[in-house]
Swiss-Prot record:
GO BP terms: amino acid biosynthetic process; aromatic amino acid family biosynthetic process; chorismate biosynthetic process
Organism (species): Xanthomonas oryzae pv. oryzae (strain KACC10331 / KXO85)
Keyword NAD among UniProt keywords: yes
Protein role: Catalyzes the conversion of 3-deoxy-D-arabino-heptulosonate 7-phosphate (DAHP) to dehydroquinate (DHQ).
Family statement: Belongs to the sugar phosphate cyclases superfamily. Dehydroquinate synthase family.
Name used for this protein in its record: 3-dehydroquinate synthase
Stored InterPro entries: Dehydroquinate_synthase (IPR050071), DHQ_synth_AroB (IPR016037), DHQ_synth_fam (IPR030963), DHQS/DOIS_N (IPR030960), DHQS_C (IPR056179)
Compartment(s) where it occurs, according to its Swiss-Prot or TrEMBL record: Cytoplasm
Taxonomic superkingdom: Bacteria
Amino acid sequence: MTLPRSSRSVAVDGAQPYTITIAPGLLADDARLARHVRGRHALLLSDSQVAPHYAAGVRAALLSARPDLQIGELVIAAGEASKTLDTFGSAITALAELGATRDACVFALGGGVVGDLAGFAAACWMRGVDCVQLPTSLLAMVDSSVGGKTAVDIPQGKNLVGAFHPPRAVLADTDTLRTLPARELRAGLAEVIKYGAIRDPLFFQWLHAERHALLDSDPAALAQAIARSCEHKAEIVARDPLEKGERALLNLGHTFGHAIETEQGYGAPGNDNLNHGEAVAVGMVLAARLSATLGMSDAQDTEALRALLHDFELPTDIPPGLPPEALLARMRLDKKNIAGRLRLVLWRGIGKAEVVPDVEEAAVLKILAG
């Protein structure tokens, strides 16, 4: 695979098409930022880790191009624990206090939590205003900022309250990865590995070959990984924007992973609970093991996946203290389930994921029990 130029763009087709731009320096590109604000109001939503680095610069860039803008700001506590209905309410209040009209724009400056919250607030305010995703984590660049899924968590489960709301644009400034903690970089790489696992064996091999460059945050390697991941997601989302079929493949490992996240209380900066990417890494191995148990795949493929995740210093086992029965109960609330039956994304080997309905709970419980 050849390395890309410093700037890449990926078109997402559909009823509301948009472009993902991947390049350094985008947060300082005043004209590019401002062109997406149709009216006079903009809300900049960020978190306590990202805002000190970038919020003032984004505000200054917007005002440089559009001095007439009225810009509100909302900074939330960093971490999944902030992705709640209460915080969503704070975003709605911020839009109301700004006097935002239907031509307003919400800028999501941060990782997946910020993107989900900002997108959901934009979807709901006046039945829908524009949202521009400014992802600052690798995970957000390759997954959560793309595709228009927005949601918050409730105690019963992750992402159970939300809406589909495609962004007006995604501007992935790769310079922001310089300030990304190593653990968060690895979490994003779990989602990158997912794309190879579900539909691209050559990408899977490339990730193994480039593992040292990626872990060292080599700009060219990261740009290639981001672009290839976004290309895969864009192709699938264009064909299945509302997740009626093929788009569910993007959830390999997520049913198991979301159950782990919910049962342990969600990861947050500074705690030992698995973050989203880490939980997905474990979930992918569990899905691969279940596939092998059901006779769908070879155990060698499971081991290849486990080995690649280990190469990227990601976990592959369920954390201790999480009862299998409790995890299964969480899985029963997964959004992909139909008529009370488990519907999981499994695989027939590397690059061959598929959705499997009516998976027997006994088989899942056996995998959860180790």
